[in-house]
Amino acid sequence: LSTVEPAKSPSESLKNEETDSLTSTFILLRSIWCTLWLSFLTMVDVSLRKAGREVISPRVKLWAQRLLKYADVNYVVHYEKPWSIEPGRRYVLMSNHRSYFDIPLVLAAIPGTVRMIGKQELFKVPIWGQGMIAAEFVPIDRNDPKNSMKSLTRAKRLMENGVLIWLAPEGTRSPDGKMQPLRKGGFLLARQTDAIIIPIGLRGTETVMPPTGFKINAGKYLSVHVGTPVDTALLSRSEKRELPLRITEELKKLSGEI
């Protein structure tokens, strides 16, 4: 589940020199081209050929792996406790959010059919947005409660069909690497579906692409820390109310903040 074992730790990669502007621009343009091309293919396959997840899911993985390869990114996955996907159960993956590179990292590193709930603005990007919708990614308007509930309903339907839903409960990228207050939508989704929450700590993605700007620094070593699953079906009412605090502390630990 991991790529080549890194020669340096994620913390050591912080000391690497930044990639020069020309190389960074080349990586960015290559990534954009790959994104647009695979998005276009997905739109065509879904709308004209009625392609299903057996076609689209490997393509999502391919896209994620290519973006990491273009940036010469290596990563390793650590499991706090081994787990496997139980047929018939619903899963909500929750991670910290420091960079746009969180997206390809999670999609490449986590097994199974993973789809993201993302802010609506991403889905307005021409071609990419339509490609994500065709691939069953779920847009959410954080400023419109009614539409947000529709998005959660759509996510529920995907979960009922074996899709693992991933979201960053902070709602946006952290400007300083520290956890921001978690939004309630993901926890509502987990409680309503008796889902198993998988906390995931992402380390080092902000060194590849900082939260401000689009410069890409190549050659970084990242790590994904998968925490102990939390089965919401086994929690009491009081424990469910404490879930946001519990997951906040878990994500801080897994992401290396504490």
Residue ranges and their predicted role:
Residues 77, 93, 116-117, 224-226:
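Generic preference for hydrophobic
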Residues 1-21, 149-258:
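Non-catalytic C-terminal accessory region of glycerolipid acyltransferases
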Residues 3-91:
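Membrane-anchoring hydrophobic helices of lipid-metabolizing enzymes
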